[in-house]
């Protein structure tokens, strides 16, 4: 369980103060450890009783974060977080029959906002459906729990992270609380140059990425805007850029000189000939349901029966019916990337090993779908990442794009410069 203090009135200023304080603490730590003998820490584990909020003595609101264990119900997680039984009963009695509150994904987090009086005020978590992750936000007003989410409540803030690798890059990033989707996206961005798992002790990672906040609580991560990896003394940089002509399709990653960063492991083929991108990867407010959703892939609008092609060489690992995805094909490629092609009307005869460009199925509207389209996903270690960063061709920058890219890159690089020379830092920039 993790507890995060929060001052709602001064949250914006608190974030700035947090950035400064952590930088100062990092600098103080470096100064204090020079010329002293390092003491080996001892790990002590002790099972503690469940947290009781009532006598905490905390006078301001704070967030409690609890991880979902296999087989947990929402009531189980809320009880473990310390919420009073009568509050849990009110929530389960009102919302216990709703599907998105019955099915929780193991290892996801449930966040509870606790007021200064020790009572629960809000509950937030994401459900995990095929192709979408939906924000469930419960808020207590006038003693009554209600579902709540709106554009006005959602804020996107750029986040800076700087990490020095100790034993492993993934472990060091996780300990610095870099979200798993950012860790896997980073792995894919530089896959053409090096493996993230190949970083050694003393190597460094500096990141600038978008974070999504709901009522002041970070609930999700967006795109990596810039990344800098120092590997064996050599610095590798990547900058996100989206031109106007790409519209809703998302951007791509280029090095500091505006060159295509990598060949993406042979992903040089679009999965189909399409008319438009009807829904890009990322978070959006559902226009009808008025809930925040992460769309875990890219939707391509195309006529029924349009051939769908493997986007790179690989091995078909699944072909059949897959829940809300309808008829789907999954292909495992090099560098740990897996692609998924959903809502197909029919399959081709392809099986086993396939070549990039080989037809694997045909556009349809099976599963949870409102019309013919292809839902295309890219995953690394099972984690959905933006396909444009790892599993779609990267266009060369035009002369007009190069000027715009240079200006955008200069701003991002100035933010990364704040992190150079600091071992570990966590900060916000707005």
From Swiss-Prot:
List of residues binding Zn(2+): 295, 299, 375
Q: How is it modified after translation?
A: Likely to be synthesized as a proenzyme. The cleavage of the N-terminal domain is probably required for the activation of the enzyme.
Q: Which GO terms describe its cellular component?
A: cell outer membrane
Q: What is the effect of changing residue 299 to A?
A: Altered colony morphology, increased sensitivity to H(2)O(2) and loss of peptidoglycan (PG) degradation. Altered colony morphology, increased sensitivity to H(2)O(2) and loss of peptidoglycan (PG) degradation
On induction, the UniProt comment says: Expression is up-regulated in response to transient exposure to H(2)O(2).
| One GO MF term attached to the UniProt entry | metal ion binding
EC numbers: 3.4.17.-, 3.4.24.-
Q: Which family does it belong to?
A: Belongs to the peptidase M23B family.
Q: What is this protein called?
A: DD-carboxypeptidase/endopeptidase Mpg
């Amino acid at each position: 369980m993790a507890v995060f203090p929060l001052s709602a009135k001064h949250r914006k200023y608190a974030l700035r103060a947090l950035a400064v304080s952590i930088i100062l603490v990092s600098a103080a730590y470096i100064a204090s450890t020079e010329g002293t003998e390092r003491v080996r820490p001892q790990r002590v584990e002790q099972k503690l009783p469940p947290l009781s909020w009532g006598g905490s003595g905390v006078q301001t609101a704070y967030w409690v974060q609890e991880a979902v264990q296999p087989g947990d119900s929402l009531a189980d997680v809320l009880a473990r977080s310390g919420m009073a039984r009568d509050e849990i009963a009110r929530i389960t009695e009102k919302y216990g029959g709703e599907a998105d509150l019955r099915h929780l994904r193991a290892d996801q987090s449930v966040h509870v906002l606790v007021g200064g009086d020790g009572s629960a005020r809000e509950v937030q978590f994401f459900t995990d459906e095929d192709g979408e992750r939906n924000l469930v936000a419960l808020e207590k007003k006038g003693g009554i729990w209600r579902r709540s989410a709106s554009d006005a409540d959602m804020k996107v803030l750029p986040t800076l992270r700087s990490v020095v690798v100790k034993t492993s890059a993934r472990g060091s990033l996780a300990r610095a609380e870099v979200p798993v989707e950012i860790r896997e996206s980073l792995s894919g961005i530089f896959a053409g140059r090096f493996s993230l798992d190949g970083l050694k002790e003393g190597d460094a990672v500096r990141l600038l990425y978008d974070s999504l906040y709901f009522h002041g609580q970070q609930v999700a991560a967006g795109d990596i805007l810039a990344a800098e990896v120092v590997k064996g003394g050599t610095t590798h940089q990547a900058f996100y850029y989206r031109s106007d002509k790409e519209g809703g399709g998302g951007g791509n990653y280029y090095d500091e000189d505006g060159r295509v960063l990598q060949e993406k492991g042979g992903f040089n083929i679009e999965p189909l000939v399409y008319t438009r991108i009807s829904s890009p990867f990322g978070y959006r407010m559902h226009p009808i349901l008025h809930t925040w959703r992460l769309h875990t892939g890219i939707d391509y609008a195309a006529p029924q029966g349009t051939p769908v092609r493997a986007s790179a060489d690989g091995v078909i690992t699944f072909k059949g019916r897959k829940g809300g995805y309808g008829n789907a094909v999954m292909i495992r490629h090099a560098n740990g990337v897996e692609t998924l092609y959903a809502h197909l009307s029919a399959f081709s005869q392809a099986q086993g090993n396939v070549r990039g460009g080989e037809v694997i199925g045909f556009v349809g509207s099976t599963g949870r779908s409102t019309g013919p389209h292809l839902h295309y996903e890219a995953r690394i270690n099972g984690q959905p990442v933006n396909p444009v960063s790892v599993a779609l061709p990267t266009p060369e920058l035009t002369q007009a794009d190069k000027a715009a890219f240079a200006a955008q890159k200069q701003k991002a690089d100035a933010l990364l410069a704040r992190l150079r020379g600091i071992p570990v830092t966590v900060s916000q920039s707005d």
